[in-house]
Amino acid sequence: MTASLHIILDTDPGIDDAAAIAAALFAPQLDLQLITTVAGNVSVEKTTRNALQLLHFWNSDIPLAQGAATPLLRPLRDAAYVHGESGMEGYDFVDHQRQPLAKPAFISIRDVLMNAPEPMTLVAIGPLTNIALLLMHYPECACNIRRLVLMGGSAGRGNFTPNAEFNIAVDPEAAAHVFRSGIEIVMCGLDVTNQAMLSPDFLNKLPALNRTGKMLHSLFNHYRSGSMRTGVRMHDLCAIAWLVRPELFTLQSCFVAVETQGEYTAGTTVVDIEGRLGQPANAQMALDVDGFRQWVAEVFAYAP
């Protein structure tokens, strides 16, 4: 199968990010041209180290650029309490000498976009700081973005505050800028990612697949967003799943705004599904997913 969709992946590994990176690398429908890192689950130094370790594990020469170390206006609030102090607790990766590109992430993204023969798809599975910086410094790049597929937000409950999902809440100003930018957005928020649960039985079959399955199984054993006894939610992997198998998802066009001022609500995505605000739709929000586990089994089988 010939890869038909050229993508750039912005990520903050992160245990479930490791699964998403595997899918982005090995799904035959995708051509991953650049990985960029951002501070989120842990510091950007750690997310960069983790991403480089994964690329070394898979013997991949995909270029990687390090991105923003802090949100646009706020101090970083990370999720080491979920992913462990390193961000990927549970597996001992082999040392390597690889380094990130010299240019920062938002400039590296600009370079790839502007040299591409046609608009490309951006996939963001961490805070949106790098994407906002790209659009702030190089607004002309918007014409070279086919769409942005992101994991973030929620029409209901949050997972970081009562109302806010982690990726949006870490840098709400960046998210607000991105949603106002006019680029096409597909939002895979908690409404759909909480449905993307891998069962204990599924997880325990991973080691028999390949080296990647063994590595992911070891990481999931240390993931504090679920457990091997109750199942694990694959939040970030949903964004890759939509790229490869959009027919598995139900989408709703809607207007999405990001609250940046509220004492208790900063980082909340205000999702106007019923059009009460009278604003034009600026996103397609994923509401439901069906057949997710089967697709995950298929895509992980492509990995070494």
From Swiss-Prot:
It is an enzyme of class 3 (hydrolase). Its EC number is 3.2.-.-. Keywords: Glycosidase, Hydrolase. The active site is at H235. One of its GO terms (biological process) is pyrimidine nucleobase metabolic process. The keyword Protein transport does not apply. GO terms for cellular component: cytosol. It comes from the Bacteria. GO terms for molecular function: purine nucleosidase activity. Coiled coil: none annotated. InterPro entries: Inosine/uridine_hydrolase_dom, IUNH, Nucleosid_hydro_RihC_nonspecif, Ribo_hydro-like. Pfam families: IU_nuc_hydro. Hydrolyzes both purine and pyrimidine ribonucleosides with a broad-substrate specificity. Belongs to the IUNH family. RihC subfamily. This is Non-specific ribonucleoside hydrolase RihC. It comes from Salmonella paratyphi A (strain AKU_12601). The lineage of its organism: Bacteria, Pseudomonadati, Pseudomonadota, Gammaproteobacteria, Enterobacterales.
